[in-house]
Amino acid sequence: MISLPSFFPARPASLAGRAVFLALLLAFAAPAFADGPVHELYPEAPDASPLPSAGRRLGRRAPRVAIIIDDIGFDAALAEAFLSLEIPLTFSLLPHAPHRLDLARRAADAGVEIMLHLPMEPLEYPRVSPGPEALLSSQSGDRMAERLSAALSRLPQVRGVNNHMGSRLTGLPAPIHRVLSVLRERDLYFVDSVTRPGSVCRAVARRLQIPFADRDVFLDHDLRPAAIDRQIEMLIRTARAYGQAVGIGHPHAVTRDALEKARPRLMEQVQLVPASRIVQTAG
């Protein structure tokens, strides 16, 4: 295995800076990128931004990786297959999923952290629907807060929230401020799934001082086993460079099998933790 170059800089705060870093990683593990309307993945493409200058380096603590599995709650058997991996995943459940309550209980019993996968308006709406009871830019702040509170009430075990779709809403400061204000009142964290460039979530989270993280790597936008394996390697390299990283996958059998295959590598090279161990409150 080629080792990670020692000159990689401190973790970029901006999406543009992270895109440049990912471009460097692609020299070692280049995946095929694809968008899709089901999960609304923002492709991890490079841009022309300059490489960020080096900053604070992390100590000898093992790099931490959180792996979030989105869209949990529809296929109970497949969710159980992920639980059988016996690694500290984080399940993000859709609020309207038919098996959400049972799977949330099973996951909690297995030590798997629970998040709410909150449907938000994509740029393609209404041609592409984020699902029932989604947060939409046409709604008032009070209406969005009501829908968010209702969704949270359906999953009392949740520790945090990430967005399902949301490429339109996550670019709008006022709606995101209202959403994150509700999370602050409930002592919940937020992970931006990063389904668009120019998301305002990090800036609003910093203003509100709520625990926050960005998604670094989508594991399965390309469902070929070799492509998923490359994305897992990218996740490991990102964590080794910056001390921690967040990966998001989806409930596919091929994703589960790839994680099983990568389990020894993950356990040896990084510390797998729930998402709550990754999120930080920006100073």
What are the roles of these predicted feature ranges?
Residues R64-A66, P88-S92, E113-M115, R159-N162, ...:
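Structural preference for beta-strand elements that scaffold enzyme active sites
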Residues L4-F21:
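Bacterial N-terminal signal peptides that target proteins for export
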Residues A29-A30:
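N-terminal signal peptide c-region/cleavage motif recognized by signal peptidases
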Residues S276-G283:
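Short, flexible loop segments at boundaries between secondary-structure elements
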Residues I2, F33-P63, I232:
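Terminal interaction modules at protein C-ends
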Residues S138-I232, R240, H250-Q271, R277:
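Catalytic domains of cell-wall/extracellular-matrix polysaccharide-remodeling enzymes
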Residues L58-V128:
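Active-site beta->alpha N-cap acidic-glycine motif
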